[in-house]
Amino acid sequence: MCSSDLKCYTSTGSYVLEAGEYQISLRTDSHTVKDNLTMTCKVAENEVFQDSAFGSGVENCKYVGKRSSDEVVATNQFDDAAGDVAYLNRDTWQIVPGTSKEATAEQLEAFNNALVVDDSYVDADDTAPTFGAKNGLTLKDMEGLAYDDAQWDKLLDQLTLDDMYKLLGADGWGSAAVDNIGKGQTYEMDGPAALSYVFDAFMGTCTYKTVTYPAEVLLAATWNVDLASEFGDAISQEGKAWNISGWYAPGANTHRNAFAGRNFEYYSEDGFLSGSMSAATVGAAEKNGMYCYIKHFALNERETWRHYGLCTWADEQAMREIYFVPFEKAVKEGGSTAVMSSYNNIGTTWAGASTALLTNVLRNEWGFIGTVITDNNEEHGFMDIEKAVLAGGTNLLFGWGTKTFDNLSQTATGQLKMREAAHQYLY
């Protein structure tokens, strides 16, 4: 049986392992096989990772349900993000990219209408959670407990709304102490090649020097996952020495071309290689108690204009076969408990407030439990913490400005969403 890593994602909305013979070889380069080191893997029939009632459009297939690494079967989540684009495929190799053109009035109107997001967050059947209970528990008491252990509810009952504001809306380079649950101040650092710097507001004047490591692209060029693991171990040991709990890294986006503005922070153009490296680094760091915010989730493959509402267009197949893979492997194989969302829109939806991305794929499909922080909030109007929490996010990187919970905090539904975000973050 071939690994499901050989699967493809079809236009009909499911993963498929196609029937046939797969030759796997060890090579010195793309063209030269090393000492005839090859093996052949045979798949007798098409295997569709879906329920039989789905109807994949694939002939002569066997339905095998969800992938073993998933919690639910994968289905299309981003049809609206494909856009009006001519995509290359096996039958249309001759497509030539057109010259740039100005949007028509009709296109601009359709685009602006698509940016409008339903802000409904009221369910009449919801009951407001308890606040400020005196149950005598501390966050330390939760150590080792499952996410759904009943003790968590008792701990969360001790939080006040002010505590939630502090946890979810005022994060960045660490999180504040919350006395009602015995949570201490924590500190977090950037970036993928080092615990690079801190801010006076949290740590005082920075008088020490940290280790700078080779860039991720050089690490990936070694193809050495053991070395990637050693990197995660080393940087987390350094974090222990400086009382650093969280790390805004690794960078897990993709080299779409040689001129991307942050290629030095990302591994490679290949999702499998990038994912193998990020999973090894994250796994080693998390074993030492450092949580790693894999970033920037997702499709942050362009630096220019990314934090001014850049809209990114891609089809579901490209997302799942290339751009999501490094994050997926970091979650499933590396055990990541933290993610940083990206500035850009996926289609017309800000990635940090995309239910499809943060809830349907990351949490429900991949089984992720943990915190999803935004990228650095530099007073960008689109970075709405309420929309982020509704979509499955947890907190805002730098809670300055007008980003508040004025709406969510006024309804039982909103308060429950805030409580769930606090639960994910504290876990």
Which residues make up each language-model segment?
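Short consensus segments that form the blades of beta-propeller domains
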Residues: T12-S14
